[in-house]
From Swiss-Prot:
Matches recorded under InterPro entries: 3-IsopropMal_deHydase_lsu (IPR004430), Acnase/IPM_dHydase_lsu_aba_1/3 (IPR015931), Acoase/IPM_deHydtase_lsu_aba (IPR001030), Aconitase_4Fe-4S_BS (IPR018136), Aconitase_4Fe-4S_dom (IPR036008), IPM_dehydratase_rel_enz (IPR050067), IPMI_cat (IPR033941)
Transmembrane segments: none
Job description of the protein: Catalyzes the isomerization between 2-isopropylmalate and 3-isopropylmalate, via the formation of 2-isopropylmaleate.
Binding site for [4Fe-4S] cluster: C347, C410, C413
Protein name stated in the entry: 3-isopropylmalate dehydratase large subunit
Organism (species): Burkholderia thailandensis (strain ATCC 700388 / DSM 13276 / CCUG 48851 / CIP 106301 / E264)
EC number(s) given by UniProt: 4.2.1.33
Ribosomal protein keyword on record: no
């Protein structure tokens, strides 16, 4: 019987299935960070349980670490406590960890793939909702709660119910100026933030196959924003080439065996999906969110929508509340919206490809950050991304134009460290969520691609980067 990619991943990890369909899944890799792991480790200690498979875990501090000078440590006592607690727990249990001043430190969903700890065919979990990122490698990856983190530490298994299968198929050549971020925002705009509820989404089609691994990670990262349990892309030569030579990857004869196995993780011809959604890549244009949900998105050449034209009273009410929070007027051209701050970073868009794309726009415009922009910051996704960008001179491109070049971390994506918006400030952000207060109490977030964020920094408002050539 023909199987989908999700079917193969699920079936190859089932330990036991109950009569109600609940399955005990084996977990190959758990990624840990400082926010959702302390209570899990505390539970182990209280029950006097060991970590079942130490080598299956990899830890890093990312949410609370400062992105400015780290020579004096962490000033905020709560943030410091969380980071110190992770350090102590990993030391006590012998878990591999990249500490704050390790060059390999970075955002958990960036360091996993770049270290080769994320591999095709794996089940991967983390106490973080954007764990779906790792599905770009043909893996089953999703976020879990703190009690589940403890369960995986203790047993290397997890109780789950199988999701339905969805295929999101994107065909054709992506127009100039459009990126993976625009693809996934267009998908969410089409199906809504509840469109993927109850599903695991496989992203396929010629447009997805043409993406780099960085681009595929961006798309899978935001599968959760479409309501899906997980997002994934089939394994191909692009996947294998990315993984070659990375620290956690098999070598020698084991590499050859692994590649042969990895390449089986694709949907079979004739595999049945519960839902299929199709997009024409040629119709995708640079996207900008206007509201307080990722589904509240439109094109750069569009306008802020008018709630009066929405027939559904529930949606109309949500639109009105979003516009009030965002301080936007219906029918305002998107290009007329001015911004106060720029954030280029996050587990969605802080890889070397993203940094290069933003730097290209800055060089092309050849001007400094606009006077009305109070802060434009670039936060690389890891110490290794930062070092690579600096070898290429990209840091100088940004700093000479008036951007701040920071240390790696989650930063302004969720404002758990000192990087945040003040009430009423408007930000062009390459992150994944534009909820009320996400980047700071009263802050107003517009989600865009790195190139779009860079252009907004220089112009002081949103601009159509397709005009840049």
């Amino acid at each position: 019987m023909a199987q989908t990619l999700y079917d193969k991943l699920w079936n190859s990890h089932v330990v036991h299935t109950e009569e109600d369909g609940t399955a005990l899944l084996y977990i190959d890799r758990q990624l840990l960070h400082e926010v959702t792991s302390p209570q899990a480790f505390e539970g182990l200690k209280l029950a006097q349980r060991p970590v079942w498979r130490i080598s299956a875990n990899l830890a890093v501090s990312d949410h609370n670490v400062p992105t400015t000078d780290r020579s004096h440590g962490i000033a905020d006592p709560v943030s410091k406590l969380q980071v110190d607690t992770l350090d102590a727990n990993c030391d006590a249990y012998g878990i591999t960890q990249f500490k704050m001043n390790d060059v390999r430190q970075g955002i958990v969903h960036i360091i996993g793939p770049e270290q080769g700890a994320t591999l095709p065919g794996m089940t991967i979990v983390c106490g973080d909702s954007h764990t779906s990122t790792h599905g770009a490698f043909g893996a089953l990856a999703h976020g879990i709660g703190t009690s589940e983190v403890e369960h995986v530490l203790a047993t290397q298994t997890l109780l789950q119910k199988k999701s339905k299968n969805m295929l999101v198929k994107v065909e054709g050549q992506l127009p100039r100026g459009c990126t993976a971020k625009d693809i996934v925002l267009a998908i969410i705009g089409k199906i809504g933030t509840a469109g993927g509820t109850g599903y695991a989404i496989e992203f396929g089609g010629s447009t997805i196959r043409a993406l780099t691994m960085e681009g595929r990670m961006t798309v899978c990262n935001m599968a959760i924003e479409a309501g899906a349990r997980a997002g994934m892309v089939a394994v191909d030569d692009t996947t294998v080439e990315y993984l070659k030579g990375r620290p956690f990857v098999p070598t020698g004869a084991q590499w050859d065996q692994a590649v042969e196995y990895w390449k089986t993780f694709k949907s079979d011809e004739g595999a049945q999906f519960d839902r299929v959604v199709e997009l024409n890549a040629a119709e995708i244009v640079p996207q900008v969110t206007w509201g307080t949900s990722p589904e509240m998105v439109t094109s750069i050449d569009g306008r802020v929508p008018d709630p009066e034209r929405e027939k559904d009273p529930v949606k109309r009410d949500a639109m009105e509340r979003a516009l009030a929070y965002m301080a936007l007027t219906p029918n305002t051209p998107i290009e007329a919206i001015k911004v106060d701050k720029i954030f280029i970073g996050s587990c969605t868009n802080a890889r070397i490809e993203d940094i290069r794309a933003a730097a290209y726009v800055v060089k092309k415009l050849n001007r400094r950050v606009a006077p009305n922009v109070r802060l434009a910051m670039v936060v690389p996704g890891s110490g290794l991304v930062k070092a690579q960008a600096e070898r290429e001179g990209l840091d100088k491109v940004f700093t000479e134009a008036g951007f701040e070049w920071r240390e790696p971390g989650c930063s302004m994506c969720l404002a758990m460290n000192a990087d945040r918006l003040e009430p009423g400030e408007r930000c062009a952000s390459t992150s994944n969520r534009n909820f009320e207060g996400r980047q700071g109490q009263g802050g107003r977030t517009h989600l865009v691609s790195p190139a779009m964020a860079a252009a907004a920094a220089i112009e002081g408002h949103f601009v159509d980067i397709r005009r840049l050539g």
